[in-house]
Amino acid sequence: MARKGKVNTLPQPQGKHQRKGKKQLENKILHSYEEESAGFDSEELEDNDEQGYSFGVNSEDDEEIDSDEAFDEEDEKRFADWSFNASKSGKSNKDHKNLNNTKEISLNEEDDSDDSVNSDKLENEGSVGSSIDENELVDLDTLLDNDQPEKNESNTASTIRPPWIGNNDHATDKENLLESDASSSNDSESELTDSADNMNESDSESEIESSDSDHDDGENSDSKLDNLRNYIVSLNQKRKKDEADAESVLSSDDNDSIEEISIKKVKYDPHETNKESEYNLIGSSEKTIDITDLLDSIPMNEQLKVSLKPLVSESSSISSKKLDAPLAKSIQDRLERQAAYEQTKNDLEKWKPIVADNRKSDQLIFPMNETARPVPSNNGLASSFEPRTESERKMHQALLDAGLENESALKKQEELALNKLSVEEVAERTRQLRFMRELMFREERKAKRVAKIKSKTYRKIRKNRKEKEMALIPKSEEDLENERIKSEEARALERMTQRHKNTSSWTRKMLERASHGEGTREAVNEQIRKGDELMQRIHGKEISEMDGEDVSEFSDSDYDTNEQVSTAFEKIRNEEEPKLKGVLGMKFMRDASNRQKALVQDEMQAFEDELAGVPNEDDTSQKGEDGVPGVLIGNNTGRRSFKPSEEAAKLSLPSRKNPFVSDSAVLKVNKPEMKEGQKKAEARKKKESPLEATEETNPWLQVPDQRTSSAKKLDKNSSKADKKNHKLKMDKVASLQELVEEPKVQPDLIFEEKAFESASEAESDVDVSVPMLKPTKGRLSIKQRELVAKAFAGDDVVAEFEKDKEDWVQEDAPKEEDHSLPGWGSWGGVGVKQRKTKPKVKKIAGLDPSKRKDSKLKHVIINEKRNKKAAKLTADSVPFPFESREQYERSLNLPMGPEWTTRASHHKAVAPRVVTKRGKVINPIKAPN
């Protein structure tokens, strides 16, 4: 917009320089105008025309301002040194000629009225500018001088506009719109319309304020509007022409299209504020680089044009397409899920056969599909054999010299040798080979059979036999000397170790460990045998050979029994006493231990005397109450039976009606005064021997002497003296044998009276009908009960079962429990009457014994309680492999174990589901390709 009272006019040059500068300025203005016209995209303008759009500023953006406000302080600073003057009317024809002498592009090629319009405009501008002082004008030569800074040139170029465009901000916007891309056509059209309207307003205002306000003012404004309309029409025609040219280029030959694109040049914009450089290709965000812009910098040839053809066609087709609106977020997510599901499904399809095979297999062994290690064979080792040691090299060289380095060479040599033999010689050779093979086979079979024999006796006999055979072989002096040296070493070792005696430390240790290991027992036996051999040599006896004799660990053929016993007893006597601590180290415990050792020494001495045949009448420790010597049971020194022999039993057997019912002897220990009733009872008892003869000693039927104590029993009413006396006497009795009560004889046992004609008949009767008498107290009684229970196990099974069943029935039967508490919930005190409270009986439901499933089954106990944990494990239906209930139950009843099934079936049944190898890395399974 123009400043109020002034019109934007071209500066008026002075004289010759004035005409020359004016001409140059007009040419420059026309050139800039042509560039702006060529850069304006008319395609968008026509589209907006067809759609009914009108050019102009939006109502919200339009506002009315004065020309004084339009020219602000910034403009005043900018144009402070400038002066503007109108052009003369005489120059209008020259301007018109210069306009016609420009390039082909013009404002209106069809109408010649533009010349008159432009001339009128210039005359009007000149008339307006005649009032300006000429001293304030600037020479164009100075303005356009090359030495002028670029800032002034840019300012001059930016302030000079075509005659129909005013010097205002909207005109500048219009120029920027002409340089912009086609994508912003709508904005450019609105701004162009706005600039045209503002131009008309500025022109009208300037003409109203001018000194000449006649009829020419309306004509000037109309001519400007006509110029704008003509310019828009020319742009529309040019757009159509450009479209036709573009279609012809696309339809023409490829070479022509590439050349057309390459010929197109980027036009220079005089209003660019940035310097031209490769770093400033894009001036603003609205400008973009197309593929055609890039092709301009490439030198073209035929091959490159052919290769760039699809790019050009693709870029043109893509630019013509429009993008579709994006789908909704939910639809996009659903499509993504479907694609992901398909991808996952395809990945899982690879694993289905592997998973199915693993589920069907009975056993999985990891690592799976492991390659078997190559096992070296004899042939492979022989083929790859290389001699390493010196001996191997010598043997290999000898075989090479003999021509027997391999089996094939050996066969060839044998064939050559056989070819020179006769038929009889070949047959004899074959017979010898067959005989040797037979001997080798028999020897191998015998060696296998001998290796399976585990008998020590056989080993010893075989060893002695080999030694004899070796002794028969004549030996050289060297062998004899070696044997003599070995025997001397053995004798020296024997003297140093003294293994033939029982006094050495080694023998003591071996005897202590003799019961813990087989090797130790063998060492002890060897020591005893060695000592026996030395004793025989000393006495001048020959060592007995063991051929054909059974050799056992403690056999009489190896050594004398007396010496064996003495050796064992000597070991016991030489045992060192361990250091006792704590309770065992107290005096009374040591005294008890000494008493025990004294008893053991007496027993050992008595046993040695018994073996030697020396009677010992003073020794009562080995005799019973009746002076009967003890008898070993099963060669066990710890168990001794003090029973009379068969002869003594026959002589001492009393003749009575019932020989099996006997009264035990009564042992009176410090018997106190007894009451009259007790005296009468004691008088009725008889003292008779409780033992009766048996044919042979039976450890299961050992009945020790039965004794009963008739000592007075203490009670609450006993005096203190009686209690003290009883305590003292019991301390003395503690060291004696434990008291055993007299066995009670059942009265319903009726024994038939028989006349014993002889002792033999009595013996037979006793052997048949002796009742079982069990001791009731002591350690011996407990062991005796255990032995009897094991021997006669199962006799009272029925009674125990019936008792257990009765307990089950009573436990499951209905019960009534009384929960009432006496005195609970009642008043107490003097004068309070006690009321009878009803008992609080709680009935517990149960199973009636008559309604039990096993009520009529005496041999069965059925548990009718429901187990909730077991109910979860019960099968509601028959499992898959079975077809009926009977098959399933039969499989459950089938026993498992090596006793009922074969070894292979048992291993298959108990094989684990997964087997892993220790130390092996289990890699993850890989899916097949």
Curated annotation (Swiss-Prot):
Keywords: Nucleus, Phosphoprotein. Coiled coil: none annotated. Residues 35-50, 59-75, 107-117, 133-144, 188-220, 605-619 have a biased composition (Acidic residues). Pfam families: Utp14 (PF04615). One of its GO terms (cellular component) is nucleolus. One of its GO terms (biological process) is maturation of SSU-rRNA. It is found in: Nucleus, Nucleolus. Residues 23-34, 670-681, 712-729, 805-820 have a biased composition (Basic and acidic residues). Residues 833-843 have a biased composition (Basic residues). Residues 1-257, 602-729, 805-843 are annotated as: Disordered. InterPro entries: SSU_processome_Utp14 (IPR006709). The modification Phosphoserine is found at residues 251, 555, 557, 758, 760, 764. Residues 696-711 have a biased composition (Polar residues). To yeast YML093w. PANTHER family: U3 SMALL NUCLEOLAR RNA-ASSOCIATED PROTEIN 14, U3 SMALL NUCLEOLAR RNA-ASSOCIATED PROTEIN 14 HOMOLOG A. This is Uncharacterized protein C57A7.06.
